[in-house]
């Protein structure tokens, strides 16, 4: 059995850990609100941008001059998985859930005889994926030095992806990130971004509105598609940021509660042990006095 001194050290250590987790919870809570507002503000813009491009793309579908980002290469052999995760841990299953979804997709494609390449954004995803797919990772970008996420960060990633596509390095690109729903719910999401997936109009939708475009649809799409790619990546980064702080806040809250439970149990054991030792000493003193 541990000595009273060891028990006191253990209780003090647990209390110190509880202070750290409580502080991290409060920091995450303070940053969550701003990150959540940024993610929610980006959604309408990204969705509207996607809708506008889908409308133009529907008119340009089948055109021999359609941009390759829309039409694709005509093949489905090489897949690039753009996996966006966080730079830090202590956030529950936030990073591992995104990695798990990407890993499952990669293994499924490889079982179908497809070639898979990985483009990692974020240190944690890279560290986990390289254990299994070290040879498939073609690029890794870390954002640890970025204090405030900006559109320029997404543009940089989009430029690298488009450059690889134009070089013929892949046929299909899928974006993986975590969509923020609430503090306790973040949804791992996979979204194909190259070639662009044009959603068909709903069966119960009314007649489609006819638009006239100037310049031609193909020319408009050639300028809009690369920007839309950056917009979708920027949205994913913002969603990830909010999801990270939500997951961290929840994880640190659970850790703080667990530390409190552990402190109570350790204190109870300490008090019982101390009481038993005092009782034993009293019995020894009384027995010695009676013997005299």
UniProtKB/Swiss-Prot annotation:
GO biological process entries: proton motive force-driven plasma membrane ATP synthesis
GO molecular function: ATP binding; proton-transporting ATP synthase activity, rotational mechanism
Domain of life of the organism encoding this protein: Bacteria
Cross-referenced InterPro entries: ATP_synth_F1_ATPase_gsu (IPR035968), ATP_synth_F1_gsu (IPR000131), ATP_synth_F1_gsu_CS (IPR023632)
CC terms in the record's Gene Ontology section: plasma membrane; proton-transporting ATP synthase complex
Bridged cysteine pairs (disulfide): none
Subcellular location: Cell inner membrane
Pfam families xrefs: ATP-synt
Record membrane topology: Peripheral membrane protein
PROSITE patterns for this protein: ATPASE_GAMMA
Gene3D superfamilies attached to this UniProt entry: 3.40.1380.10, ATP synthase, gamma subunit, helix hairpin domain
Keywords attached to this entry: ATP synthesis, Cell inner membrane, Cell membrane, CF(1), Hydrogen ion transport, Ion transport, Membrane, Transport
Similarity annotation: Belongs to the ATPase gamma chain family.
Subunit-structure text: F-type ATPases have 2 components, CF(1) - the catalytic core - and CF(0) - the membrane proton channel. CF(1) has five subunits: alpha(3), beta(3), gamma(1), delta(1), epsilon(1). CF(0) has three main subunits: a, b and c.
Function, in words: Produces ATP from ADP in the presence of a proton gradient across the membrane. The gamma chain is believed to be important in regulating ATPase activity and the flow of protons through the CF(0) complex.
Descriptive protein name: ATP synthase gamma chain
Source organism of this protein record: Rhodopseudomonas palustris (strain BisB18)
Gene name per UniProt: atpG
């Amino acid at each position: 059995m541990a000595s009273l001194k060891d028990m006191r050290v253990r209780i003090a250590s647990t209390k110190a850990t509880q202070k750290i987790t409580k502080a991290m919870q409060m920091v995450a809570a303070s940053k969550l609100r701003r990150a959540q507002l940024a993610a929610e503000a980006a959604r309408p813009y990204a969705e509207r941008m996607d809708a506008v491009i889908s409308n133009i793309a529907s008119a340009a579908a089948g055109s021999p001059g359609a941009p390759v980002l829309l039409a694709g290469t005509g093949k489905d052999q090489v897949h690039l998985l753009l996996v966006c995760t966080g730079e830090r841990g202590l956030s529950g299953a936030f990073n591992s859930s995104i990695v798990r979804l990407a890993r499952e997709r990669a293994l499924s494609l490889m079982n179908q005889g497809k070639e898979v390449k990985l483009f990692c954004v974020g240190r944690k995803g890279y560290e986990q994926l390289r254990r299994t797919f070290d040879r498939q990772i073609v690029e890794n970008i870390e954002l640890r030095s970025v204090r405030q996420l900006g559109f320029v960060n997404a543009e940089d990633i989009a430029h690298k992806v488009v450059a690889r596509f134009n070089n013929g390095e892949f046929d299909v690109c899928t974006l993986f990130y975590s969509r923020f729903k609430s503090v306790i719910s973040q949804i791992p999401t996979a979204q194909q971004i190259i070639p662009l997936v044009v959603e068909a109009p709903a069966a119960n939708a009314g007649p489609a509105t006819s638009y006239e475009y100037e310049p031609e649809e193909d020319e408009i799409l050639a300028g809009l598609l690369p920007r839309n790619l950056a917009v979708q990546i920027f949205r994913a980064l913002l969603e990830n940021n909010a999801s990270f702080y939500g997951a961290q806040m929840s994880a640190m809250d659970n850790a703080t509660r667990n530390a409190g439970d552990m402190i109570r149990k350790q204190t109870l054991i300490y008090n019982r042990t101390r009481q038993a030792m005092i009782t034993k000493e009293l019995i020894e003193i009384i027995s010695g006095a009676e013997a005299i």
